[in-house]
Curated annotation (Swiss-Prot):
Stated name of the protein: Peroxisomal biogenesis factor 9
Taxonomic placement: Eukaryota, Fungi, Dikarya, Ascomycota, Saccharomycotina
Keyword entries, A-Z: Membrane, Peroxisome, Transmembrane, Transmembrane helix
Induction / repression: By growth on oleic acid.
Record region (Disordered): 180-214
Compositional bias (Polar residues): 181-198
Membrane in keyword set: yes
Function text: Essential for the import of peroxisomal matrix proteins.
UniProt organism field: Yarrowia lipolytica (strain CLIB 122 / E 150) (Yeast)
Length: 404
């Protein structure tokens, strides 16, 4: 339908004719044609102060202005996300590098500490040891230690495994094999204990660089203070067995095997008080060899049972091979329950737990072996809790009264 037809249908005033309506329609059509974009641009470009580039810029800017907020927010969000991800990865990498450096520094310090201990041991190994074959020499050594430390304990014995007795006398390391129920005989010439076998022979192995001990024997070493005879009286064994059984039963810990009639299963700690030998404590050798962790718990049970009756003075002095004198002075200076001590013998390190135990008759010091570490492995191979205990323990290295 044409425009004129549409106009004819419209209600028109009575004084209007058809020619007037056609003229109005022509004017309207002309105005519509003027609205064409090309004609608008041509008319605008006819002005002197406006060109086509200006109009293009205006049109493009107008289009961009309609899309700028959404595009900007999207671009900024993606950029911020990528930046934070990269920053996080960088921080994690730097933290890992820092922790690795700290670990390397700590490992180096531990190695340095092991080197220092090795140097001390090497220097002490060249110290000339006195001859122990003469009784006068042993008396002189004992008097020397008494004057410098105020002690009357200079030797130690060690019970290993089933029937082997390791004995430290003066400054010499002795190895003897004992049969069941057979006591060690005391030498009248030298004044020292010598372990004899059932076949009537003595096996003496002095401490020298060439003498080596098996790792199985070393793993069960327990240093003890000196006693007059190696055999433990059965009455004392039974008393300690009952005391130990009561303590274990109270805490529901498995009781170790303590046979009063057989010495080979007894590992005891002995001390010297007022010039006489006193049995301090006895434990099962099988328990130390097979279940050391359980023994540590048992020791803690006994310590907790008698926490207050600590002696005013009790000293445990042991000399274990190659001039390495380990001196632990247990008086007011060292009354920490469960402190860890480092022992050394023949190129091996012994880390043990020293605890206080008190019964009705005597004060008890228990040394429990944790681990044997060869000199090549250094201290760094020990578990972390041992490092922590060693740092807080009263470990004194010395030789001839000179502490290191």
């Amino acid at each position: 339908m044409t425009m004129s037809a549409r106009v004819r249908k419209m209600a028109l005033p009575s004084n209007c004719d058809l020619s007037d309506v056609e003229m109005i329609c022509d004017n309207v059509l002309g105005c519509l044609e003027d609205l064409d974009s090309s004609r608008v641009v041509s008319r605008v470009t006819s002005r002197e102060d406006v060109d086509e580039s200006t109009i293009g810029d205006l049109i493009s800017l107008d289009c961009v202005s309609l899309e700028t907020p959404l595009f900007s927010f999207l671009f900024l969000g993606v950029t911020l996300f990528l930046f934070l991800s990269l920053l996080q990865q960088s921080l994690v990498f730097l933290l890992g590098v820092f922790l690795r450096l700290v670990q390397l520094v700590g490992h180096f310090l531990l190695l340095l500490m092991g080197e220092q201990i090795g140097v001390i041991d090497k220097a002490m190994s060249h110290i000339p040891l006195p001859e122990v074959g003469q009784h006068s020499q042993q008396v002189q050594i004992q008097h020397l230690v008494e004057r410098r430390f105020g002690l009357d304990v200079v030797t130690a014995i060690v019970v290993i495994g089933d029937n082997e007795l390791f004995q430290v006398v003066g400054h010499q390391f002795r190895v003897g094999i004992m049969s069941d129920g057979q006591r060690s005989q005391q030498s009248q010439n030298s004044g020292m204990n010598v372990a004899s076998s059932s076949r009537g022979r003595h096996q003496l192995v002095p401490d020298r660089p060439g003498s080596q001990l098996s790792s199985q024997k070393l793993s069960s070493l327990v240093p003890l203070a000196r006693i007059a005879a190696a055999e433990i009286p059965c009455a004392v064994q039974q008393s300690l067995s009952r005391l130990f059984a009561r303590s274990v039963q109270n805490r529901q810990v498995q009781r170790p095997h303590l046979d009063p009639q057989r010495q080979r299963n007894i590992v005891g700690v002995f001390g010297v008080q007022h010039g006489r030998a006193v049995l301090l404590c006895a434990l099962g050798g099988d328990l130390i060899e097979k279940r050391p962790n359980q023994l540590v718990r048992v020791v803690k049970v006994l310590v907790d049972k008698f926490p207050r009756r600590l002696p005013k003075r009790l000293v445990h002095l042991v000399h274990l091979g190659r001039g390495s004198l380990v001196h632990c002075r247990c008086d007011r200076v060292c009354q920490q329950r469960g402190c860890c001590h480092l022992w050394h013998c023949g190129g091996h390190f012994f880390v043990g737990l020293v605890s206080w135990i008190v019964d009705e008759t005597a004060a008890c010091v228990v040394f429990c072996l944790f681990k044997v570490v060869s000199e090549t492995q250094r201290i760094s191979s020990l578990p972390r809790y041992m490092h922590r205990e060693l740092n807080t323990a009263g470990v004194v290295w010395g030789c001839g009264g000179k502490h290191m």
